[in-house]
Every structure is written in structure tokens, then in C-alpha cells.
């Protein structure tokens, strides 16, 4: 039996979200959540968690290309810790280097510049984070 996973691509203005199943190893983008000065809309996130009931939550870890941490890395870790503390969910961190670049490339290929909307990029980035977690995790 597979597991249901929910992934977040944390950002200080927008948080991408995706849902996926380990059986297929694929993910589907959900609407992005707005954040204000790095503070997530916890009510909307709680509603999403209740609706999808994930077995595990994945949070993208934004590292520099050389693997070192940046300011956003610390904020993403804090977000992951708060998810676990507030909702009691099992949270894992996943390296997200280049997911935003890859997401923009995929969206541009499908629809050009007009398709490059921030919410779509964040959602597809969350999909890529989740799919990469499925690929490199044994459950």
C-alpha cells in the first residue's frame, strides 16, 4: 500500500503545494498559499492538511549550489518545525536545488511568457520536490 505525501515549496511571499502518491511516484500541483513577510496562512495550511490527510509532509530545503545554507534555508527549516509542532505531522526535508528553474522551464515550454505566473511556478516546484523525494526515499 502506498503513502500519500504533501509537499511545500516554502517562500516568504508564496508557498507552493503539491499532493502525490508513492505508488505512482507522481505529484499534482495544488493552489499556492500566500505568505506575508514569511508568515504562512496557517488556517489555509491546516485546511489543506485536513482535506488531504497526508501520511508524510515534505518541505523543500533551499540550499546554495555548493550545498551551503542560506537565509531562506533557515526559514524553510523553521516552517517544517512549525508544521510538525502545530499539526503533529511527519515532516521530511528534501533538497530543492534548481526546482524553481526547472519549473519555470517546464511552464515556459507549455505556454511561453504568459504562462509564467508565480503561483504556477511554486506549485510545479512543489511537484518536483515531491517527485524527487519519491525517487530517493525507501518507505
Curated annotation (Swiss-Prot):
EC number annotated for this UniProt entry: 3.1.-.-
Highest taxon listed in the record's lineage: Bacteria
SUPFAM superfamilies in UniProt: Ribonuclease H-like
A Pfam family assignment: RuvX
Biological process per Gene Ontology, one example term: rRNA 5'-end processing
SMART domains the record matches: YqgFc
Entry keyword Protein biosynthesis: no
Stretches assigned to coiled coil: none
Gene Ontology cellular component annotations, sorted alphabetically: cytosol
GO function term, MF aspect, one: nuclease activity
Entry keyword set: Cytoplasm, Hydrolase, Nuclease, Ribosome biogenesis
Main subcellular location of this protein, as a coarse class: cytoplasm
Localization per Swiss-Prot or TrEMBL: Cytoplasm
Keyword Transmembrane helix: no
NCBIfam families in the cross-refs: RNAse_H_YqgF (TIGR00250)
Protein purpose: Could be a nuclease involved in processing of the 5'-end of pre-16S rRNA.
Family statement drawn from the similarity comment of this UniProt entry: Belongs to the YqgF nuclease family.
Record-given protein name: Putative pre-16S rRNA nuclease
Amino acid at each position: 500500500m502506498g503513502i500519500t505525501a504533501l509537499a511545500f515549496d516554502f517562500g516568504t511571499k508564496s508557498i507552493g503545494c503539491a499532493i502525490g502518491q508513492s505508488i505512482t511516484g507522481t505529484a499534482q500541483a495544488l493552489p499556492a498559499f500566500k505568505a506575508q513577510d514569511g508568515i504562512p496562512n496557517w488556517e489555509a495550511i491546516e485546511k489543506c492538511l485536513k482535506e488531504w490527510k497526508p501520511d508524510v509532509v515534505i518541505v523543500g530545503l533551499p540550499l546554495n549550489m555548493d550545498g551551503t545554507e542560506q537565509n531562506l534555508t533557515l526559514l524553510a527549516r523553521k516552517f517544517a518545525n512549525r508544521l510538525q509542532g502545530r499539526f503533529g505531522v511527519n515532516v521530511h526535508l528534501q533538497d530543492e536545488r534548481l526546482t524553481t528553474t526547472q519549473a519555470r522551464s517546464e511552464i515556459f515550454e507549455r505556454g511561453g511568457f504568459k504562462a509564467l505566473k508565480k503561483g504556477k511556478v511554486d506549485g510545479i516546484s512543489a511537484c518536483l520536490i515531491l517527485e524527487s523525494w519519491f525517487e530517493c526515499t525507501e518507505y
